[in-house]
Amino acid sequence: MSRYRGPRVRIIRRLGVLPGLTNKTPQLKSSSANQSTAKKISQYRIRLEEKQKLRFHYGITERQLLNYVRIARKAKGSTGQILLQLLEMRLDNIVFRLGMAPTIPGARQLVNHRHVLVNDCIVDIPSYRCKPEDSITVKNRQKSQAIITKNIDFSQKSKVPNHLTFDSTQKKGLVNQILDRESIGLKINELLVVEYYSRQA
């Protein structure tokens, strides 16, 4: 399954707020409408929707998410927490969480277009896995600097999570450590995602 490129508002109406996909928020339906359409939701559907939240928030394909689940299963520790750490340490997500892009698709475009450096080297792979002590900077070109400056001004309301630090004057971010569960910028039950893939991974 390829990466989703359709209307983003349609997705957040169904799944709720997904800050990585779009900075828009869904319009809440009235309580009377909710009551009239209330149905018993199957456990499978609940697990499916949690999986879809991860996929759309981080902007990855079904195959990529399945691969991350397989990697997480092989690692020591909580599979769900390791899965979230793998996704959060992707370069496109780090660029987004630093406030250098308004969304993860926007961050992916910056990386693809070679505007972003990791440890002073251009990295154009959005899935690149960042690690503690990595520095994230912007290419020293007028176009690159202008794009990031505009994005930083737009994202000033967003708080940089504790596992990252960002110097807006130098446009430099630093990965301090692997993030903890509380720093995830998404309301998600990762255990349901692991259960969804229990027969596939």
From Swiss-Prot:
GO terms for molecular function: rRNA binding; structural constituent of ribosome. Keywords: Chloroplast, Plastid, Ribonucleoprotein, Ribosomal protein, RNA-binding, rRNA-binding. Residues 89-150 form the S4 RNA-binding domain. One of its GO terms (cellular component) is chloroplast. GO terms for biological process: ribosomal small subunit biogenesis; translation. Part of the 30S ribosomal subunit. Contacts protein S5. The interaction surface between S4 and S5 is involved in control of translational fidelity. PANTHER family: 30S 40S RIBOSOMAL PROTEIN (PTHR11831), SMALL RIBOSOMAL SUBUNIT PROTEIN US4M (PTHR11831:SF4). Belongs to the universal ribosomal protein uS4 family. This is Small ribosomal subunit protein uS4c.
